[in-house]
Amino acid sequence: MKRIAFVFSTAPHGSTSGREGLDALLATSALTEALGVFFISDGVFQLLPGQKPDAVLARDYIATFKLFDLYDIDQCWICAASLRERGLENVNFVVDATPLEPVALRRELGNYDVILRF
């Protein structure tokens, strides 16, 4: 079975990309366990707690990330450089994601057959 990586690289609520990516991830998790989730660039903002999407008339889908355990999604990484650039090194995110430096993150991403970017 092919290994599938989901890469979140956009900020939440500015577009539907993050919500669509999360929906696709959860649907795919019903078909395979060979999944990895990566948060890079502005995608690290997807995991911030306490967001107020109603202020921009958007749906609050961020809490849905907390369902990763229920869906057996446990391979989750976040770019350490992206965290530093945005001053988010000491934040408690809504899911447990392992910080990786860019070289290690690219190496891990190279272990996947299919990469879907949102």
Swiss-Prot record:
InterPro entries found in the cross-reference section: DsrEFH-like, Sulphur_relay_DsrE/F-like, Sulphur_relay_TusC, Sulphur_relay_TusC/DsrF
Residues annotated as transmembrane: none
Domain of life: Bacteria
Subcellular compartments: Cytoplasm
Pfam families reported in the protein's UniProt record: DsrE (PF02635)
SUPFAM superfamilies with a match to the protein in the record: DsrEFH-like (SSF75169)
A cellular-component GO term for this protein: cytoplasm
Keywords noted in UniProt: Cytoplasm, tRNA processing
Gene Ontology process terms (BP): tRNA processing
Similarity remark: Belongs to the DsrF/TusC family.
Subunit structure, interactors included: Heterohexamer, formed by a dimer of trimers. The hexameric TusBCD complex contains 2 copies each of TusB, TusC and TusD. The TusBCD complex interacts with TusE.
Stored NCBIfam families: PRK00211.1 (NF001238), sulf_tusC_dsrF (TIGR03010)
Role: Part of a sulfur-relay system required for 2-thiolation of 5-methylaminomethyl-2-thiouridine (mnm(5)s(2)U) at tRNA wobble positions.
Classification via PANTHER family: PROTEIN TUSC
Protein name, UniProt field: Protein TusC
Organism this protein belongs to: Salmonella paratyphi C (strain RKS4594)
Source species taxonomy: Bacteria, Pseudomonadati, Pseudomonadota, Gammaproteobacteria, Enterobacterales
Gene: tusC
